[in-house]
Amino acid sequence: MIAGVDEAGRGPLVGSVVAAAVILDPHNPIDGLNDSKKLTEKKREKLFVEIQEKALAWSIAEANHIEIDELNILQATFLAMRRAVDGLQIQPDKVLVDGNQIPKGISIHCEAIVGGDASHAEISAASILAKVYRDQQMKLLDEKYPLFGFAKHKGYPTKAHFQAIAIHGVVDEHRRSYAPVRRALNIDC
């Protein structure tokens, strides 16, 4: 059995980095799997439910903004990936990771695949779970801080996000290790 692993949320200035691990059922295929960035929001949300219903096993995990600031975004991403793999109810024989690096600490044979979210269904499914879950987090953060527009820009460094920071400052969930946030706090970069 093969598990696909992918992440969402490395680039934003706020919130957690989210990883998902998925083992698909070869006898219960899911149509339309692709890199989450190539799908509409509506299609991702539909597949989010279908993946959870049809996969043999799936797990979503995260590393929060504090862990990102303590470890750095790469190591926090690897932490979230390890947590996602550890959270699977079935242990896979192999783990396919989207990207060019393998997280340390996964005891199962891993293979890094650049562009794997577009070429391997297991990674595509993980990409969708991670992206939709993180987008849901941003919608909740938007309810908590409606002046920031998190539901729209998802925490990415957009003009609207920078304007909100300039007017309202940063929120607790901002990643203080990121240069734009440090500048807003007048911390040396």
UniProtKB/Swiss-Prot annotation:
UniProt KW rRNA-binding keyword: no
Record's protein name: Ribonuclease HII
MF (Gene Ontology): manganese ion binding; RNA binding; RNA-DNA hybrid ribonuclease activity
Gene3D superfamilies to which the protein is assigned, alphabetical: Ribonuclease H-like superfamily/Ribonuclease H
Family assignment from sequence similarity: Belongs to the RNase HII family.
Domain RNase H type-2: 1-189
UniProt cofactor note: Manganese or magnesium. Binds 1 divalent metal ion per monomer in the absence of substrate. May bind a second metal ion after substrate binding.
EC number from the UniProt entry: 3.1.26.4
Keywords, comma-separated and alphabetical: Cytoplasm, Endonuclease, Hydrolase, Manganese, Metal-binding, Nuclease
Residues holding a divalent metal cation: D6, E7, D98
Superkingdom assignment: Bacteria
InterPro entries: RNase_HII, RNase_HII/HIII, RNase_HII/HIII_dom, RNaseH-like_sf, RNaseH_sf
A biological process from GO: mismatch repair
GO annotation, cellular component aspect: cytoplasm; ribonuclease H2 complex
CDD domains for this protein: RNase_HII_bacteria_HII_like
Cofactor: Mn(2+); Mg(2+)
Protein location: Cytoplasm
